[in-house]
Regions:
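Flexible, glycine-rich terminal cap/loop adjacent to redox cofactors
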Residues: 6-11, 20, 25-136
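Conserved core segment of the aminotransferase class I/II
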Residues: 1-5
Length: 136
């Protein structure tokens, strides 16, 4: 769509390929966006990581799907640069993190978003809070 709009309207927009979500529809689902922790380690890039396990989520307990995790990586300036998710409905949860990577949002700001309780999306909030040692 970006290429078509550029051609038709004379725009010069670019695509941020790091913000394109990756989804695998297996059981459990797997999804990610941005850089992976392995890439950061291999490149020697300084980063921070927050992690949250599905087994600690009330909604995961209610639906009987306790396996999985959400991992969020930031750079030294607290900008969200990547996320890896494994678990129930993580392909649906990825949108918020794709937005954060695409717009260069800070983890502290995204962590202020109120998430419904009980919901699987609370895991996103908790993983982000874990980056700052504020996980419940």
């Amino acid at each position: 769509m970006v290429a078509a709009a550029n051609a038709v309207k004379g725009n010069s927009e670019t695509v941020n390929y790091k913000a394109i979500p990756s989804c695998v529809y297996t059981e459990p689902e797997v999804s990610g966006v941005g850089v992976t922790e392995d890439e950061l380690k291999a490149n020697g890039t300084p980063y921070h990581v927050g992690r949250f396990e599905f087994r600690a989520l009330g909604k995961a307990k209610a639906i009987g799907k306790l396996q999985g995790f959400i991992k969020v990586m930031t750079d030294e300036d607290d900008t969200i640069i990547g996320a890896s998710l494994v678990g129930p409905h993580v392909t649906d949860l990825l949108t918020e993190l794709s937005l954060a990577v695409g717009l260069g949002l800070k983890a502290k700001d995204v962590g202020k978003v109120i998430h419904a309780h009980p919901s699987l999306s609370e895991g996103l909030m908790e993983a982000i809070h874990d980056i700052h040692g504020e996980c419940v």
